[in-house]
């Protein structure tokens, strides 16, 4: 910075002019942020005075109520932001506003590094964002404890001036903004209120808006309830804040309020709603956890404070410090964010586990029925084994035997002594699952099966297929082995026996007829009441997942399944007697189509099925 011939006029040096031009024209995406930056600076000034007044009460003079004022003059197109904070003397005014990208706050922090003070102006360029909307800016200021005031002025180009104002200036700083023609929107009272409430609602000092009639209204809450001790927050305060951040009805089902004082300092106040948002499964749904830095709103976009599978959470995370880009609009990726995300995830999973253990029924009705499917999305992601196990422990699945939702731990506790796997069945609904022929062999042996009926189940089961050393296995798999489990005795059950040669002839015939449809035909060990079912070869996609992939054009053709037949079923007995008859092919195709329908697979040739059925009906 070089002083010109005029004793009170200064020019920005060449590098500073470049930075200033960048700030005005390129740095910020939204013009609104200038107001956030100026309010943040005002908050810093008030904090400085409050801290300094602990040692010298006279600095408060006769004006101890610390506040920020915003006033407007539509006729002259002037917007003013003022505070009664620490203020600046001539030297500080020249240094702090005359040097772009140099922070007065940084110097003040150095002088008070051993004392706790809350300052949010980190970068020294935020002030200059005002020139996005201003033709000219004037700053009137008087430092607390001094008598002389000064004025700084600039058009945001190459120079600025500083003049003495005498002793008539109030303590603090007043910024007078002469708005550009394209920025007159900031003379609208409702626009100003919206910007302040969005970005600076929780600044610790009251912000008043003074309209042209001189009416003074406080437009911020001047309180960040998350900074209070959790025992000091009333139910009404929680309800009001939840309503503001969640934008959903009802009360919060669970509140998670913690302060982390480790290497990364932050406070979280998170809510789990009691009502499922209508857009929960919208892929474009925005995150609902807002990031603050020292009570100043930063963003709720492009920051992953929580994993996607916890997107039902609402609330705030307030950090002591995080590296932002120079505009404070976006975060720089760093290890602190990773630590915060991991810590928050652990805390939320722990709190959910406590509720699930202490009140299982209320956990299912209040949480799982609303957000269980979203939580299971996490099982599709790559994550540490311990996190996956904790996520599994929160899951609830419908039990065939108990006819209710249970945990995997409950399932394991009641497993057959010889059982080494957790058996499951993916289906579109409870009713279709209950009627699946695949269940028959498990029911006859007293084995429990879990029903997976959410669409997401088809995805995670191929990724997360083990819990506490137990494989989670679909009962549709061809490798399911039930030989180790004895069937329960059924009184009065008649079993039709056939010679091996007769069965072998039928299987050979079926494989010949269905050579283009199935991989193989074999005798089933799982069927007791149905004549046929389909089994999925190991390594192949589950039927429902394959159907989805075909619908999404991710697969071009269906895989061949294994057709299992119940050798003791009367229908199979009749077909054995007709293995050499002309209608045997129609019977075989109908059996295959029946198996497809029962397991949710499409009938590949409905015309063939219709004709075969018609021919057989004509024969009766």
From Swiss-Prot:
It is found in: Cytoplasm. Coiled coil: none annotated. Its main location: cytoplasm. Residues 1-328 are annotated as: A. Molecular chaperone. Has ATPase activity. Belongs to the heat shock protein 90 family. Homodimer. This is Chaperone protein HtpG. It comes from Neorickettsia sennetsu (strain ATCC VR-367 / Miyayama) (Ehrlichia sennetsu). The gene is htpG.
